[in-house]
């Protein structure tokens, strides 16, 4: 989906920006799987790799529990680190010349990372309750990201 969004938004750097979109898409997909883990588990969908669940001493049934155990919390923290790594790589790939064009994807990443921070600060208690950002906070984050990208774009050297 992120690759399609990048194509629709347009870009100049044919090598780096598709890589950005790939990494951003992976970050967003993994984030969605973590954020909605309780909902997915209730529908019999378990997206975490078996070897990683085994590594933390967990199994799919643990994701159906009403309480987040320490082991499950560690698994969630590990997944969050992976998401953050994809996010960092995505931003590293995105060239300045394409940042404004890719602003919608940057906003989606911004919102996901803000929510991931909230999840971490809550102790990864994703099995107990759903964590979300208020609409006003979402608006603020999106506006701030868009404004920052417009300012950055204006500072770029003249384009031909």
Identify the residue ranges that each predicted region occupies.
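Catalytic cores of Mg2+-dependent Asp-rich isoprenoid enzymes
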Residues: 2-28, 34, 38-160
């Amino acid at each position: 989906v992120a690759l399609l969004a990048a194509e629709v938004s347009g870009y100049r750097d044919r090598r780096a920006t598709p890589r950005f979109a790939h990494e951003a898409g992976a970050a967003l997909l993994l984030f969605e799987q973590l954020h909605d883990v309780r909902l997915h588990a209730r529908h019999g969908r378990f997206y975490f790799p078996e070897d990683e669940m085994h590594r933390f001493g967990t199994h799919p049934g643990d994701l159906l529990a009403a309480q987040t155990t320490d082991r499950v919390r560690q698994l969630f923290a590990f997944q969050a680190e992976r998401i953050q790594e994809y996010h960092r790589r995505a931003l590293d790939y995105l060239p300045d010349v394409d940042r404004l064009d890719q602003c919608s994807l940057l906003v989606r990443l911004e919102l996901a990372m803000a929510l991931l921070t909230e999840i971490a600060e809550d102790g990864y208690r994703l099995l107990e309750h759903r964590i979300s950002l208020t609409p006003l906070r979402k608006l603020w984050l999106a506006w701030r990201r868009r404004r920052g990208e417009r300012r950055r774009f204006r500072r770029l050297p003249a384009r031909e």
